[in-house]
């Protein structure tokens, strides 16, 4: 698919284009309105398409929990290895369309690697994530930024004292969730490891507050997010933050999302996942 089409869809889903402007630009690139509408299913997510770990996988215990946040209870999907052993914990933060089956599936994938994983719903203060993705996107724009960060920081504290964890907590997130993962790293001294996928970078003056080790995944074609890398790296080095950065050439924003035909980049996604699990193993299991 033409990368320009993927780029304007990214601008639309991140709030830089309204739907009318997006469809106008898409029609111009596609060669007409009919062709534009024919492309929409390829651009959107099909969460049922890419389920890898079923909810009833016998190796896991799954369900939903609530933990206290700054705005009240936050609902989260939970998955953990079956058994009585205590394991490290990982927070999985969704993209800018709320908590969906894909992110819950990612949490189960994490759990199968020996972690207790929770995927909080950022839209809990607004009644939870609706099924309609456009409505979910609109609700995400209504969230208060500071309160939302506090709700995810509260997840660190919840997991640190959870009776089924070792008290060691990591965090990972995608797109919007990647940026939120960076904010959790800035605001939680108890976080040990953070893995933002193509996430918006924090302000340089906030970087010295990061105590966690970072594993940074970026997409080579993601001009919008990559524009902030240079300043972020300079701040990380100046503050002596432990980090590794990988650039996945030929991949675009959201390359890990295997529910999106137009965005998923299999080779980049598989390599980033391997590196992520190895990173969490080294930082949370030792």
Language-model segments: residues:
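Short beta-strand element of the alpha/beta-hydrolase
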Residues: 86-95
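Cap/lid segment of the alpha/beta-hydrolase catalytic domain
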Residues: 123-146, 254-260
